[in-house]
Amino acid sequence: MPLNITQNLYNVAKQRMRERQIKINLLNYEYQTVDEIQGYVISGNINCDSNNDQRRSCSITLVLKENADFEIKSGGRIWLDRYVQIYIGEYNILAKDWEWVNLGIYLINTPTWNYDASTNSLSFEGLDLMARLNGTRNGYISDMPTTIPQGSNVRNAMINVLKLVGITKYVLEELPYALPYDIQVDVGDSVYSLLSQLRDVDATMEIFFDVNGVFRYQKIPSGHNEPSLLDDDVWDNIVTSESITSDFESVKNVVRVFGKSLDPTYYPSAITQSGNTYTLTIADYPTSFDNDTSFTVGWTASTAVASPYIKVNDNNALPLVNEDGTAAVLDRNNQYYVARYQNGKFIYLGYQQIYGEAKDDNPQSPYYVGSTIGEIAIPLSGGEYDNIYTNDLARQRAKYELYLRTRMNDSVSLTCVPIWWLDVNIVVSYTPKDSTVPKQYLVKSFSADIQESGSMNISMIAYYPQYESF
């Protein structure tokens, strides 16, 4: 979700002197405002972590401005059927007005109301809306085991799952391929478990609720072709400390992913090659096909070719294509390959042992394989990797794992005056204290103290434009 950064918000971010207010809207489950709480913050914090599906959380204690009844009970202002939407306001010295920023919508947890002759305070924790899906507040599957069959559209499957818990606000991207295997959860499992399995079909996707309470399923932003939304014009006014750490034990600059070991439906008894066409002799090969016909074929290619065709027995030669429809490339001599027949064409899956590799080949990276550190490799197999059923998906996963094991370890942490409109997975420009050259970073997490004198801690990873997007 793109940030809407106005000039007024930008100006306030540069102010050294801050005057701060908090406003809390009480919402029903239709996201309609039904009440409002105003007060002075005694303590509290806002947290956001892009590596956690429960992206946002908060904890707030405030002295109430009013002498209203905040008894925690059914039908009261604070109860299980309420969301809280938190706004932070800061006074704009130039515009002589308040600038308000939405910090997210939360479920109320552990509320406490204290009222006596000298006290009228309210404290609570705010849970990410994912708590409605993972069993914390709701989301258990109670009727019967649920199965999403192979071949299903992942986006449509997610929509149907969200309907189970009444989530109607969502933005879901399409995957270019269908669900490659059955997904099943048992009674007592959570809706979140089902959604996370659908997400994990492609390791480069993420699920989360944004600040407006919208459920999102999208590519994890890599920073590729994104503009910097913050630079030293702001940082120079607000940064109070900086730390740079590297976890050498976690650094890996070569990642090898071993996916599913494929067992083809049909094996040829003879193979011939003419140009880019392979002719396979298969005795028990089907003689009739319809739209539902699907099976796999395996064969050994003696030479590597581009834009190959597969001809079985006396049938017409059919193109071998990737799942996105582009022509496949057989990249190794004497390699055993597997393809799936579907809808009148062969879809390239990969080697019989699905495999993908990624290396840090960017000379600008401190973990470049051509530097003095050489190659530091890690093989990944078994468990969730067994669900990876094409070489292309294995390569994508390897690129993502490389990102986690290199760029996530080239990081900087800042302490600064809070920037309330900041969000995770945005690109910023910052000049480290030991350098005179600005570097680009991706914001990965932050935590902010919402008291008047509170500060913000920000964790960022280095972004290298030379990297291709994963």
Over which residues does each language-model region extend?
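Acidic, glycine/polar-enriched metal-coordinating patches/loops
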Residues: 303-350
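Short coil-to-beta-strand transition motifs
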Residues: 96-106, 332-334, 432-442
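Short alpha-helix capping/helix-loop boundary micro-motifs
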Residues: 59-74, 280-281, 321-327, 410-417
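Exposed extracellular interaction/assembly regions and N-terminal maturation sites
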Residues: 265-315, 347
